[in-house]
């Protein structure tokens, strides 16, 4: 124990000697005015540094020394930062309008409107951002054009004009002019059927009159009634193919119409004869039997 106390006293004496030496050196510097240390002047706008150290307990920087400086707290002069005087009394305010800058283009200008040279003088000049459509377009002009969607068929990309015309691409609305002679003039279906049935019935009536006059003695009156009723039924129940033939015949030339009408009549007569052949042999009249 005595040894430890002696060591502590020696350390205190050494520390006191170091402090005594440092105090003497400071007095020497003060006595020599030529070798006085020149301290740096503090910067304008900054406080004077009165405390500085290194922070060694920062885990974020792996305990590397980080300098820390603290400045004396003095009233800051904020007059250099921005002026505290009064602002402008009458600031300029630009005109404010809810309309856009291009909205005035839709109004009719005061100056006279002039159309390009290539257009006719009768055409009214347009004004505005987008040219306006003239509402005076007649309905007859619209009827002469047929609007449809274009589709390209058998397109060959190996040709030299690879890209087709822009108006003929897929899905483009194209207007084709309808020529006056190309419009089909199709008669109504009722007229075709009436003409076909009327011509057939007239010729059939002539043939039946001749046949009846020649075979009046061979056929009984009961069979004639049955044949007349069956003829009426067959006229009403004509097949669809015969109707189509008659409709197509009316659209062709007059010479072909006559030929098709004759063929149609012959076909109807043959069908009637095959359907209405008498199962029993013809009954002879009593005059010839006697």
Curated annotation (Swiss-Prot):
Stretches for region Mn 2: 213-246
Origin superkingdom: Eukaryota
Keywords, ordered alphabetically: Cell projection
Keyword Ubl conjugation: no
GO CC term, one of those recorded: cilium
Compartment annotation: Cell projection, Cilium
UniProt-annotated stretches for the region Disordered: 76-112, 197-228
Entries under InterPro entries matching the protein: CMIP6 (IPR031365)
Disulfide pairings: none
Region span, Mn 1: 128-160
Main location: other
Keyword Chloroplast in record: no
Protein name: Ciliary microtubule inner protein 6
Native species: Bos taurus
């Amino acid at each position: 124990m005595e040894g430890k106390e002696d060591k502590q006293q020696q350390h205190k004496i050494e520390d006191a000697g170091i402090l005594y030496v440092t105090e003497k050196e400071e007095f020497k510097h003060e006595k020599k005015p030529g070798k006085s240390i020149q301290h740096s002047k503090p910067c304008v706008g900054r406080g004077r540094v009165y405390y500085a150290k290194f922070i060694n307990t920062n885990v974020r920087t792996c305990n590397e020394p980080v300098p820390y400086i603290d400045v004396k707290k003095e009233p800051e002069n904020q007059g250099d930062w921005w002026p505290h005087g009064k602002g402008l009394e009458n600031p300029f305010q630009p005109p404010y309008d809810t309309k856009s800058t291009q909205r005035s283009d839709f109004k009719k200008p005061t100056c006279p409107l002039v159309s390009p040279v290539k257009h006719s003088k009768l055409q009214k000049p347009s004004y505005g951002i987008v040219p306006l459509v003239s509402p005076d377009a007649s309905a007859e002009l619209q009827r002469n054009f047929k609007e449809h969607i274009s589709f390209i068929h058998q397109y060959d990309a190996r040709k030299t004009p690879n890209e087709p015309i822009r108006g003929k691409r897929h899905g483009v609305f194209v207007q084709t002019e309808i020529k006056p002679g190309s419009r089909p003039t199709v008669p109504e279906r009722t007229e075709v059927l009436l003409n076909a049935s009327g011509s057939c019935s007239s010729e059939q009536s002539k043939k039946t009159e001749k046949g009846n006059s020649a075979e009046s003695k061979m056929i009984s009156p009961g069979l004639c009634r049955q044949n007349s009723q069956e003829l009426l039924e067959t006229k009403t129940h004509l097949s669809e193919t015969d109707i189509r033939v008659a409709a197509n015949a009316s659209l062709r030339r007059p010479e072909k119409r006559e030929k098709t009408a004759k063929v149609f009549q012959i076909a109807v007569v043959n069908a009637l004869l095959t359907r209405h052949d008498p199962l029993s042999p013809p009954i002879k009249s009593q005059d010839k039997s006697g």
